[in-house]
Swiss-Prot record:
The keyword Translocase does not apply. One of its GO terms (cellular component) is cytosol. GO terms for biological process: SRP-dependent cotranslational protein targeting to membrane, translocation. Residues 1-297 are annotated as: G-domain. CDD domains: SRP54_G. It is an enzyme of class 3 (hydrolase). This is Signal recognition particle subunit SRP54. It catalyses: GTP + H2O = GDP + phosphate + H(+). It comes from Yarrowia lipolytica (strain CLIB 122 / E 150) (Yeast). Belongs to the GTP-binding SRP family. SRP54 subfamily. It is found in: Cytoplasm; Endoplasmic reticulum. Its EC number is 3.6.5.4.
Amino acid sequence: MVLEDLGKRINGAFANLSKGGDIDEALDAMLKEVCSALLESDVNIKLVSQLRQKVKNSVKATPNGASKKKVIQKALFDELVNLVGVDESAASAAKFKPQKGKSNVVMFVGLQGSGKTTSCTKLAVYYQRRGFKVGLVCADTFRAGAFDQLKQNATKAKIPFFGSYTETDPVAVAAEGVAKFKKEKFEIIIVDTSGRHRQESELFTEMVDIGAAVKPDSTIMVLDASIGQAAEPQSRAFKDASDFGSIILTKMDGHAKGGGAISAVAATNTPIIFIGTGEHIHDLEAFSPKQFISKLLGIGDLQGLMETMQSLNLDQKKTMEHIQEGIFTLADLRDQMGNMLKMGSLSSIAGMIPGLSGMASSISDEEGTRRIKRMIYILDSMNQKELDSDGSIFKEVPSRITRVARGSGTSIREVEEVLQQQKMMASMASRMGGKNGMMSRMQNAQNNPAQMAAAQRRAQQMMGGGAGGMPGMGGMPGMGGMPGMGGMPGMGGGMPDMSALQGMFPGGMPDMGQMMNMVQNNPQMKAMARSMGLGI
């Protein structure tokens, strides 16, 4: 059972709890379904049994007059977080915070085939996109082709690398590579070490020797999520031999035992800092237990979305100014499309937005990215006068559409769809702009961490009906106008607090069911959603 299916099963159990009837019977049925789903995901039976008992104990302690349903929902959420998390002191101690202007050495360890070399490149890209000067060192002299693999990955990602085809001593290669990058003032130096097919003593000796030579600021173990519960003894064995501080769990995107692997690692009290969610170099997500469970249950991860946007330093200043004036040009649309590609996969972004998580499975990341790129080709084929316009120039001179289609290698229909999307965004911008517009109200709420935390808590309290149908769960306004669900124009300044958005709708914010009906019943919105790769 992949994690997506696990989330659906748990959400289905929540939905049954909301149907009414005897609450105690509903609790037993819900726990039976949740525990069954966890066991199928290879979570240890002892851990599942403990979760069931802790939830029941929390419900028994419910004070008179309190809502049992809310207590059950909160208790299960908290216990799921505890299942995949470690205590705060261990997480804080292992948290790697690289400093700019200083050389930070990171050493990777793990068994062969765990995805270690690929994860090295992913982490390098992760920090490179955040402004760090990153270098890769291949100290894996055991596996044939290891240096070629790292070289290929690093070249594709445009990351400087170091390795040797002739030197067979991994300690010498590691020391030389780290010394070279330190001399050249690299800020993050990632050392890839050798792996083995099993836990051999030579591997552990080699890890200790390399660690002594390069003196890493952080040692990360890479584990394959497909091994499920076996992650616990494997991580304990490595922990005893090399005192690594944290773990990257790979292959979380398509294996049935991902949940079991996470809970098994958590049982060792070793924090997971990243999870690999795909084969591409950008498919690496920072791991937070609360945010992970929130996304799993379809609640979204507003905090994670904000952190992603802020860490990438997306340039939204010009678009923000236009929105405040009630304007949205074709150039603004091009900027938004570019920012979408920088943020990562569409399904990952969808998973961070409350209520849209359930739609993530209908998005093919490859197809969505392809369509966004084609939209950018179309916009890049326009001249500056056209880009600075509101699109009406194409209506006045229709031959421009044909010229742009030919120049971009696309069809007239695709150009018209881009113009239609810009028109819808411009219409939204006109409603949002001005002193009394939505943007003005949003700015009063954004950039406020306390309000953001409160918004996430409110989302958690609305878990009753599962993703896409949580009772009373507010959807994001104007979903049809969000470029590929990347967010409202100007969202780079921070997501607005949900309570602030509530006040902008006199009748209350529409839930996701209502919003989907709006899309289905509006041909323009439906066409635009399809153009973005949504299965609508």
